Amino acid sequence: MKLPIGFETIHLKPYPYQIETINYGILHRNAGILLSMGLGKTMCAINIARYRIQNDNCKKVLVICPLTIMDKWKKEIQLISEYKATIIRGTPQQKKELIKQDTHFHIINYDALARLFVPLEDKKFDILIADESARFIQNPTPKRTEAALYLSKIAKHRMLLTGILISKRPLNLWSQFSFLDKGKTFGDNFYRFRNTYFYQISLGESKFKKYVVNKRRIADINKKIFSTCILFDRKEISDQLPEVLPTCKSVIVMDEDLQNTYDNIKQNILSEIATEGGEVKLGRIKILGRLIRLQQITSGFIKDSTGEYVRLSQTPKLDALVEEIESIYDDDESMVIWCCFLFSIDMIKKELAKREIAYISMTGADSAKEKNKKWMNYQKTNKIKVFIGQIVAGGIGIELFKLDATENEIQHMLFYDRTWVFDHTEQAAGRINRLGQKAKVRYNHFVVENSIDEKMYDTQTSDKDIADEIMSHGVKKFLT
């Protein structure tokens, strides 16, 4: 398959599946680009926009993306296209002036859409590109979703970019496709869509209810999705990706004292939940908030009577991680360590400092500019072998494979803490498994035996939702 006559890519030679994706986007007025992480969604979208600029009288493109990857988008546009890009940020007045700039591409983050709706509407963008749409265009009621849906109605062309179209909340399909084709695929009424394709169930004996897909409608849903979307996953093009070694699970055993501490906290949590009216009155958010205390114990710390976090005297999971770090470091290979908790990151940093091992760390406290500087520095600097990140802050939009790594090397990703949302883990895993890299990829999950770590790992690897499991069967059954 070839690109249209007279149209060529710049700087990068596309793979066959990318050519097919670009052609699909050119042939369809609106297109969902469903490529797994690291397969080049951005490159395909930019080239589809380039074609429309050159052939379809489209002059103004608005890229809507997470705040943390705005600079990455600008860099990609300027690298693989002949056009300039403007990032919309600064004071409210500065943002309005930036929208007026006469560049082909403008880049904005989702949360700014509602506040800048009027000047964006006045600009009359020809093409809208929604990156990471499954994470940011969800429930139809938030203002950012409302603004995105309205702006999409006045654009000539629209693109959705996501690696995971249907996450744990398939109801979000409606908002995404309402953006993509103004209701052509799934209708213009959310409640009609919900009642047509879903039905309500109760979770176990609790009073909580959840909408699930009607299995008799799955074939119809798939048919509608792929009438406007193109999909490539890693399995289809595995011969073009780096080799992924078997996933490891480092199982850590608590000694008697730590097990007693864990069990006491667990009993306290169960008593609190029972005292405060059980799962029905508390709700999943408050219950998960309590269970975090068990995660913190397995990670090696606890909150004391003054409300301060303190390191436990016994930290078997941290000890196992440090041992792994030393082994990888001695082999002169690189590693990415993902944590959920800031205190976990602090403990790891102290252990690395003791051993005089250089590292780069990234947390949610870093600005978008700081994050970009950090991951790019790690990627380019051979002397720094360790990257430590807070998974919710760095799981999307960054690339953490070493640019100079060879096919004889292994790039390691170590998961120290888990989040409740498995999508976060999948997104983070894709940061080192990218198209075009040469080194092998290895994942290792650190799991404390007979603890919440093990329950979370087993539940998520069985493709189940942790919160649903807890609300269906109760906290006590989940923990035992």
Language model feature labels by segment:
Residues 1, 27, 39-40, 44-62, ...:
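Conserved Helicase C-terminal RecA-like lobe
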Residues 1-34:
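Conserved pre-motif I regulatory segment
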Residues 37-38, 155-170, 178:
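Conserved helicase ATPase motor motifs in RecA-like P-loop NTPase domains
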Residues 44, 57-79, 167-172, 340-342:
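Conserved Walker A/P-loop ATP-binding site and its immediately adjacent core
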Residues 69-92, 183:
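Conserved helix-turn-beta segment of the N-terminal RecA-like "Helicase ATP-binding" lobe
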Residues 107-112, 118-122, 143-156, 160-161, ...:
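Inter-lobe coupling linker of SF2 helicases/translocases
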Residues 109, 358-455, 463:
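Conserved RecA-like P-loop NTPase helicase motor core
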Residues 131-132:
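Walker B catalytic acidic pair
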